[in-house]
Amino acid sequence: MRVGGKAIVTTALQINEKPQTQETKDVKYTVITFAPVQGFIEKSRKLRDLYGASQILSYLSWKIVCAAKSKGFDVISPAISEDDCINVASVDIVQGMPNRILIKGDFSGNDAHQALMEGWKEIVEACRKWLGENLEDLKTDDSGWARSWTRWKIHAWEVFRGGGDKIEKAMQDLETRKLRRGWTVPNWNGESSSLSGHDAIAYPNMDREITHENKRNESREREEIINFYERLAAALEGSKQKDEPKYLDPSEKLSIPELIKRLVTHHQVSTLVDRLANENRVIKRGDSQPVFRIDNFSELLRKDDESGETYWTGWFMGDGDEVGKHLKSLTKPEDVTGFSKSLRDWGDKFQKGFKLGRVVYAGGDDFFGVMYSQQKGIKLKGADAIDWLIKLREDWRGEDKNSEQLGVKLSLGFVWAGHSVPQRDVLQHCREAEKLAKSLGRDRVTIRVVFNNGQYVQWTTPWKYLEWLKDYSDREGGTNWSHVYGDLAHLKARHAIPSKNAVRQDSAIALALLDLYFNQNVIDDKLKKSNILSANQPEITGSSKDKDLIQWIENMINVGWQLCSIT
């Protein structure tokens, strides 16, 4: 149809679907979630941005939860006490808050949107205020600059609401409504961000009006952008929070949402957010830490300050398998609350108990962290990483090894990275490794060893077969991995073990090699690795083809050689 001279296209789905603002009758349960319109949260390419994005999501969820509680609604999930909303927001309360909220009763989508926008406004205005105070001479109050920030303040998020007389129906209603998105993406003139390429580069004159008298001058724009980011980098580094790696490299050119993700982790900006959020509340703060504050990342540089020696680090990204499906299977509110509490308790315990590095965020079913030696001059060994991965699975399963403590299985990507691998590449490798672990059947770990030249070797295995690396024994009864690594290379060179592109595939030699080195103290034939692998090949390798079985064995040896070798 045509309205006011403009064509309006309406799909069949939109005709049949109730608008987001229209509430469902006889609603006993409400489910709320939200998403950024441009995906700027999940497209983080720096560790600091990833942390900032995680905290933004958690903080906005907390605002919605508190809004529901303030109106007398019972929040079923996430599990949160009344005091957690009465008290000031802090890292301990907010971190790991999921952005899917289940509420008992008919909670308005408009109220959820208002609560989210209140929290987002606090974040945006804190960033604007800091820029205005620290870059006064750059005229950051330019009308175009203000216009751009206002657009992102209004159009950054979309809220989805589902309702039903049962929890399962409310969840289904939410998924249906998510199919129809009604967001508006802010438009812009000029060049796009150097990180994502999706949005305009943020700088004071980014949205100046182009007229006949005020023609666009690309050379002048570039000079203004360079000047802005040089000044911004200097202001961030000169604010009594010395940090490595630096908050901002002057060569980076960020969009407004990318800049917000970076700024919220700065101690001055996080304090401003805290102040704006609580300026009208009489609260005893105590010793709680502001929501977005984080210590510096200097220990993640992978280089010893004194000796200049470099070292490898482990990066892990884990996620519970089919959590949404598990939630739908829980029909009683108390079961959902119990599951939510278990996830949050696990994430809190995991974060506080991790001694081999730092957990950047832990939301219960999803977490991300970095493994490194906390003692100067002592390098973290790859074998230590394997031991930790084995123990992680045990911790996730809980005391009863025959069932999952949390009701869901775990998929994880682990990256062992050389010191010269750029941080953005490491994060991408983590995402790919986790995705691969899920795609091959879930309940798996993918270990990827990334070298400084960008090449890598990897191995994906169900968790319980990770311990096979510990069963290695060389021809002399030791643990020298060069024996099996050398034999593998020799057999491949002679085509005794075919390449993955060979027409004829026979796994017999590869299985014999597995038995030769990984059957220490095994007497029963049924317990031989070759027989276990052959009998359970589809489950273990994700395929019944010989070439995939050969590749699985080869990958295990390559990864074991890199992480467990004593030479």
Residue ranges: model-predicted function:
Residues 1-567:
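Regulatory and interdomain segments flanking nucleotide-handling catalytic cores
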